[in-house]
């Protein structure tokens, strides 16, 4: 679906936006910054359409927004370190978590960044291996390997490490 017209954008926002925001929240752990990052990615997409045109805009926007959210987190981290050095208290820190089961969220958070991102794209956004590979600029084999490792790590963590082979 091309997000090139107002109608396309309205349709995207109505159908994909909530899932993309949820995916970015899961990938980055940034509950409050995810909607802003998704909106920035959409604006960037409209201002400078990527070439070649992505096969799946939801996946493309999720990756772009995840990157924007991570950049914002880095900036906040640098700001927090500077504030600590100045002994200025940070206000408004919200430690709210997703409505996911605590164990599942903890297991997902424990995954390496790329595995977590690939899992969310694949399982939450129902993206194919090829679409994820294209969006992340990696091979399909890399995506498959990361999915396999992520599934193993999640299963081990969620079952208390009581898995065979």
Language-model features, listed with the residues they occupy:
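A short, charge-rich alpha-helical start-of-domain segment used by transcription regulators
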Residues: 1-22, 32-35, 116
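Sigma70-family region 2
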Residues: 2, 40-57, 75-76
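Amphipathic, Lys/Arg- and hydrophobic-enriched alpha-helical face
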Residues: 12-31, 48, 62, 108, ...
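Short, small-hydrophobic-rich alpha-helical interface motif
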Residues: 20, 24, 34-45, 64, ...
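Arg/Lys-rich amphipathic alpha helix in sigma70-family domain 2
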Residues: 63-85, 97
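DNA-recognition helix of helix-turn-helix
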Residues: 66, 136-160
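Short amphipathic alpha-helical boundary/capping segments
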Residues: 103-112
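A short pre-motif secondary-structure segment
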Residues: 118-122
């Amino acid at each position: 679906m091309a997000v090139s017209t107002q109608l396309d954008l309205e349709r995207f926002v109505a159908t994909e936006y909530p899932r993309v925001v949820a995916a970015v929240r899961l990938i980055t752990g940034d509950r409050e910054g995810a909607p802003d990052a998704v909106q920035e990615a959409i604006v960037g997409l409209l201002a400078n359409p990527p070439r070649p045109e992505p096969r799946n805009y939801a996946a493309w926007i999720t990756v772009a927004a995840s990157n924007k959210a991570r950049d914002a987190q880095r900036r906040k981290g640098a700001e927090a370190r500077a504030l600590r050095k100045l002994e200025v208290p940070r206000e408004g820190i919200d430690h709210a978590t997703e409505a996911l089961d605590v164990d599942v969220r903890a297991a997902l958070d424990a995954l390496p960044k790329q595995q977590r991102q690939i899992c969310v794209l694949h399982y939450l956004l129902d993206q194919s291996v090829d679409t994820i590979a294209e969006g992340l600029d990696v091979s399909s084999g890399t995506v498959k390997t990361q999915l396999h490792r992520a599934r193993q790590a999640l299963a081990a963590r969620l079952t208390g490490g009581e898995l065979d082979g």
